[in-house]
Amino acid sequence: PKKDTSGTITYTTGRLAKPLDFFAYFLADRPNAYTETLLPVEVGGRTLDIALRSWPDDPAWAKQVGGVLAKGLPVLSDSIGLPWLDPGQLVVAEAISRSTGGYSGRYDPEVGRIEVAYYASPRVVLHEAAHAWFDGRLLAERWANEGFASFYGDQAAAALKFKVARPSLTSKQAANRVPLNGWGPAPGTDVAVDEYGYVASAEVARAIAERAGPAGLASVWQAARNGVAAYQPPGLGESNGAVGSGSDVGAVESGAAPPDWRGLLDLLEDRTGRTYGDIWRTWVIRPEEASLLDERLAARRLYDDVVRRAGEWQLPPVIRQAMRAWQFEQATALLTAADHLLDDRAAVEAAAETAQLELPRAMRAAFEGQASFAAAAAEADAELQTIAAYRAAAALQPAAPDIVLEVGLWGATPDADLAQAAAAFSSGDLRASVEASARAQVAWAGAAELGRNRLMTILGATIASLIAVGFIVGRFRSMRRRLARRAEARAYARSVRTLATREAVRSRAMAHPIDQDPRPRGRR
């Protein structure tokens, strides 16, 4: 370029070998020369004041673009299923196209500004307006944002009866095919690749939308907006509209970054219950990434099987993290270990059911926690041993104890010990359960022998007591006989003395008859 004294700039070329192939164009504008008009638009229950900035000599542009936005933004919000996300003011400015093949519009999410060419069609306006949602903060990659901005823009245009021509992929554009996950950021340096990328990404978005359905896509966007990745723990169910791998599963794990091509595939399949691997293989991935999709498919099948088998139990977070990061070798190893632990759980459940014991929560807590599976395996072994101790004690419990067992159990409370063992097991105090079971087992196991010993002791004591009583009674009776004989002897002696006295008196009487009484008669 050459500039003369008047300020005129002249561009010249040298001799052209192929002058018919030569093409040049010039762009110029005055970015600060705008007339601003505020346009209030109701979007998702919120009133937006859109700043329309048109060139002073082109009021028709503001009228046309403002009319499209006033009608289109509410339709876009309803179709996408999200409210207006940008807290700031939306600025829509008239501009010129700065490329020969790119779109005649551009959206800058950093400042909330849309530039729309002075000649742009309603389709372009709606496409750029859709970028207010698909601006890199909802989805991470260019192809996804461009594709769904085109899809929803075209959908809104059709709903509003705008006549728009939807471009289809030409063979010339297809010749510049690149994997969409390798399509670089805008603005691209290769115009032909960009042309392919815009059209191909729109084709992919339409294919995805046809398979997912409006409600399925809305669920994906809601999850992406809230930072909710795929592979959520069980228990969320209908509240998140989730189906598929791990989605009928406690607390939402949020904080995920906007999904890239991998996270988007996971979210789509998780939220819609459909598969999209064929679309990804055809349009999105590099050839060397095809094996990664195969690994993913096998890992997801195993994941679904283990989640289904786990039931109400949640898989530990480390498994879900490995699946989200596409670390499928690590995820497969962890899932296999989890499956083995579920075998242990089944063994513990069967043993507890047989023993009529309520399972503690310790194994589940260890399984679902951040620790390694070794803690859960150790807990399973400990619970099995505790149940075995309980069953060993319960097996000795007599249905109807006889007198020998009853005597042997004097002072022992094995029934209470067994009940204590069951309660301690259910509360997770395995040591106390084993100790209580041991007390019950020892009491019942030794009751018969102890009862016999006690009865023999009682019998011996009884016999000794009877002998002592017999001896005492014999002695008493012997003493009574001796006393009786003595009393009889004394009575006999008294009788003899009495008889002797009587005989003596009689003898004296006979020796002195009354007629021979020497005393004078008058003194009688």
Q: Which residues make up each language-model segment?
A:
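Short, aromatic-rich amphipathic segments at membrane interfaces
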Residues: 435-457
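Selective detector of the "anchor" transmembrane alpha-helix that sits immediately C-terminal
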Residues: 454-477
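Acidic/His/Gly-enriched intrinsically disordered linker/tail segments
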Residues: 119, 142-214, 218-257, 304
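Extended, low-hydrophobicity, Ser/Thr/Pro/Gly-biased non-transmembrane segments
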Residues: 1-32
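Beta/coil-rich, acidic/histidine-enriched accessory regions frequently appended to metallopeptidases
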Residues: 1, 192, 230-438, 459-463, ...
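Cytoplasmic C-terminal tails of single-pass
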Residues: 480-524
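Juxtacatalytic substrate-recognition/specificity segment
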Residues: 35-137, 141
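Soluble non-cytosolic domains of exported or imported proteins
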Residues: 59-71, 119-120, 124, 139, ...
